[in-house]
Amino acid sequence: MSSRRLGRLLSKLGVKRGAASASARAAAVPDAHLYRPLFSPWFGEGEFQRYFAMAAPRTLVSADRCHVLYTLLEQAFHIEGNVWECGVYKGGTAAMMAALISDRCPAKRLFLFDTFEGMPETNAAKDRHRKGDFADTALESVAAYVGHGALCVFRKGFIPDSFAGLEAERIAFAHIDVDIYQSILDCLHFIWPRLSLGGFVVFDDYGFSSCPGARAAVDEFFLGKPCRPLCLPTGQAVVFKGVSAP
């Protein structure tokens, strides 16, 4: 059948040629429903959704950002060292990561750092958050939600004081979600020298206008270093510690 005759037939059936073509193109694209407009696998029904369901009730971290954590954490399982999260809040992303570690790499430990009483003093010139923000949490509640017993090591207190005694630690993956300039700098000064080659640091707040101090701290720390932050459209930034990185 010629294209002209097919067009007339479709017209009689009430189907416009453009709509038919669009439908055919969509059918030819695997997982077409996940293009919104770009491929967005965190909307799918795969394994990630099971882990994200653990995070969702108790986190402000969106599905696309959790998918970044999930994907990079899996890739860090073969790297020497443990997993750190600085800025736990109500424990949503901690619960997701603890479950993933328990299932895939139970030899690793998840270190969790937070005041569990809200933010410390902030820098008024660099930060929009203020002391006491995110105080609606408590260590006991978070620990009960995250679970996984000895796999999780909770360190309550201010950063960097809560890092005391961990100088010999090796780190494979770190999630830094503390929002404010000085705390992020303090995290980096301690974590970066202990991050194993091939390891990742994910900064949750880098690209958000609500956290200008986050980007300022990250950019300042990595200025002149061979490793540079990769800014993602999720608002996060990722730094990979390459083979030659100091």
Task: Briefly describe each language-model feature range.
Residues 1-56, 242:
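Membrane-proximal basic amphipathic "stem/tether" segments
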